[in-house]
Amino acid sequence: MAVERRTVGIGYLRWLRDLWVRRDNRWVRRYNRTAPKLLCIHSHEGAWNAYNPAGPYYGSLQMDSSFMWAYGADKLAKYGGRDARYWTARDQLAVGFRAVRARGFTPWPNTARACGLL
């Protein structure tokens, strides 16, 4: 059975490129606004592999297990249920972005005040 090939016009390809550029720009703008704020929280909370046994809180954003399940269940599955101190910095920031989108900076009240975010 032969596969029919369709040619795509240059207009469609330009439209598709522009669509992806617009979507990418929207994400970049959102990232550029939030990333420095999360990095400020990171600088106050600890290293990427930080562990606070008194909490227990894990990772540089000091996430507890309920926080990780709420905003990073896919990351928990990716790392086989291991806590955030074993996650990459990129994965920890991705979970932080989700939390900021949902709740603002309230999960880190004292640190957010120190960073001037609350």
Give the positions of each predicted feature.
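Peptidoglycan cell-wall recognition and remodeling modules
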Residues: 27-118
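Cell-wall glycan-active module
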Residues: 1-34
